């Protein structure tokens, strides 16, 4: 891959209704700035009109040392490509981040794994200057061995290989 954002391949024939439900983030590539640390779980829904919405939670540290569970909300605007959305997101509390990011589904089998990608800022050379990505699993225990290779190949294709950190699930957000 030449790492041009405009050349990144996304999921073909993406089926939003099969994508709904709960996904556990098992790895993430961070953007610049405040971000969810771990215990990240996302829930996607599609309403009667076909609109996609999502909620997510995860552990954050704000004000340098205050640890809390952040609840986030997002609405998805369709684009001509069914696997590419514009996501407007905000937090349940005013001090959490708000924004408008691309939300691309790079690949998924709907039942086990999904690879998400978002480039916030494209560099002058067409590569991604600031972006983030989640590797999602339907299982809190992580990816199945047979999905690992596919995911590694896709990380390479989106030029984020070696930039991911594991996302732990300790139940932090369940208790709060």
UniProtKB/Swiss-Prot annotation:
Origin superkingdom: Eukaryota
Subcellular localization(s) per the UniProt record: Secreted
Residue list for modification N-acetylserine: 1
Pfam families linked: Lipocalin
One annotated Gene Ontology cellular component of this protein: yolk
Binding site for substrate: 97
Entry GO MF terms: retinol binding; retinol transmembrane transporter activity
Cysteine disulfide partners in this protein: 3-159, 69-173, 119-128
UniProt-listed SUPFAM superfamilies: Lipocalins
Keyword annotations from UniProtKB, A to Z: Acetylation, Disulfide bond, Retinol-binding, Secreted, Transport
Family recorded in the similarity comment: Belongs to the calycin superfamily. Lipocalin family.
Role, per record: RBP delivers retinol from the liver stores to the peripheral tissues. In plasma, the RBP-retinol complex interacts with transthyretin, this prevents its loss by filtration through the kidney glomeruli.
Protein name per its UniProtKB record: Retinol-binding protein 4-A
Source organism: Oncorhynchus mykiss
Name of the gene: rbp4a
């Amino acid at each position: 891959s030449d790492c041009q954002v405009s050349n990144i391949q996304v999921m073909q024939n993406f089926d939003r209704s099969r994508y709904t439900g709960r996904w556990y983030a098992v790895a993430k590539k961070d953007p610049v700035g405040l971000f969810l640390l771990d215990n990240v779980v996302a829930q996607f829904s599609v309403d009667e009109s076909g609109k996609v919405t999502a909620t997510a939670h995860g552990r954050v540290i704000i004000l340098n040392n205050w640890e809390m569970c952040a609840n986030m909300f997002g609405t998805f605007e369709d684009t001509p490509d069914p696997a590419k959305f514009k996501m407007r997101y905000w937090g349940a509390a005013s001090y959490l981040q708000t924004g408008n990011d691309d939300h691309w589904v790079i690949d998924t089998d709907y039942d086990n794994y999904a690879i998400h990608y978002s480039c916030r800022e494209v560099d002058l050379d067409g590569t991604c200057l600031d972006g983030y990505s989640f590797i999602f699993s339907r299982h809190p225990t992580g990816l199945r061995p047979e999905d690992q290779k596919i995911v590694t190949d896709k990380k390479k294709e989106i030029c984020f290989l070696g930039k991911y950190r594991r996302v732990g699930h300790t139940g932090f957000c369940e208790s709060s």
